[in-house]
Each structure stands twice: as structure tokens, then as C-alpha cells.
Amino acid sequence: MISDYEGPTPTKKFDQDILFDYSEGEKEFTFELLDSYISSVEEHLPELLNSFEAKDLKGAVLHSHDIKGSSSYIGCEAVRYVSGKIEAYCKNDELEKAESFYPELKKEVEEVFKILSDFKKNWDKNHGEGGSDDGGDDNESEPTENNNNDGSSVNNNDSSSGGGGKDIENKNTDENTGKNLNERSKSPVPLQTTLKPVTIETPKTASDKIATETPTSLANNTNSSSNNNSKNENGLNSKQPQTSSNSPTKIQTK
């Protein structure tokens, strides 16, 4: 509404100081944000003038609104106020009244652009290009070291290995021999292929004992039987059992 812009234009160009918040390491105003604002105003300011010349009320509303919105986003109070006044008069079908504030808007924009340009130049001068506090590359980091279990340190930023700047060498050596325990032996250890013969003893059964005994006892039994038969022939009273030739011979084992 027009009543919102009846007062004088604010003398303060921004509603806050343009600065960087170092405590949190984050920028309140990034260069990208400032460049985006400048590009937006540089685009819409000439288009607003063209709309005035073409008596394009709708176009004037559009471009003045865009300038006001981007100025409000970064707290550019003076430009926001003048562009908002132009938008309000355009919406009220007062194109000529709105056009009368264009020179003031252009003046405020030029002053703001100068402030932003000086701000960036001073930043580059004091802190170096790229926005880092030490003037160096933000992506460049100090070499870091890791400690191994044996107390030795490892440089993780050694670029000699070509592996992304992290050549980690673990020096684990034997205290007595000084040999690196991580190195594999170049001569492979042969596998043990010669096996010692193993003798397995199994218990013998009764039949095994019979099979392995010498026939001496059997021979003695045979001789004893012959003697008994001869005694029977001589008239002795002892009798020998008659066995069939087909019946198996029984052998008593004790």
C-alpha cells in the first residue's frame, strides 16, 4: 500500500552491518549471495525503465517487485523502500507517479553497488582471494600424522605415493632382529610332504591266536593219541573216542 511508503527514504543502506561471523566460521554474507543480488538488480532495473517508457504497468509492477524482494532478502533497506514505493504506485495505476521515483531508485542502487564492491575489495586485500582467513586455499590442509601401535608416526599427506596424498607405511619390526614383520618372505616355505610311517597294532582274537600259533602242540597231541592207540593195541583198558572223518576236530584252548 502507498501509505507504507509515505515517509522519507531510510538513510541507512542496510538494516545490519555487512560482515562475516568468524566465531562460527560461517559467513553472514557470502560472495555468491552478494553477486546474486547484484545480478538480479542489474537485470530488473533496466527492464523497469523499459516498462515505464512503454507505459507497461504490469511489467513495472513485476520488475519493481523483484528488486524489492531481493533487496529485502539481504537487508538492503534503502533500495527495498524505494522499489516498494514504485510497486505500490504502479498497483494503484499511478504509473507517472511511480516513474518519478525511478531516478532515486537508480541512485540508491548505484550507492549500494559501490558499498558491496568496496566490501569485497577490502576483504580480498585483508584476507586474500577465496575468502580464507589465512589468505590460502581453503582446500589445502596441514599434514596430519597417525600413530601406529608401536609408537611410530605416519604422514597421511605424503603425495609421493600418488594415492590421494595418503601413503601410510606401518613400520613394525622385530626388536631382536630388526626385521620388518610386515614383509612377506620372498622364498616360499615348502610344504611338509614326507610323512613318517605309523604302525597300528590291533588286538588279536582267539582265532587269530590259533592261526598264528605253531603246530607244535597239535603235533604233541597227535603223538599222544598214537601212543594211546598203541597202548590200546597192547591190551590197555583205556578207550579212545571214535570220531567220524567228516566231523570237525575240536581243539581246546586254555
Curated annotation (Swiss-Prot):
The modification Phosphohistidine is found at residue 65. Residues 166-186 have a biased composition (Basic and acidic residues). Residues 146-160, 220-238 have a biased composition (Low complexity). Its main location: cytoplasm. It is found in: Cytoplasm. Pfam families: Hpt (PF01627). Transmembrane segments: none annotated. This is Phosphorelay intermediate protein rdeA. It comes from Dictyostelium discoideum (Social amoeba). The gene is rdeA.
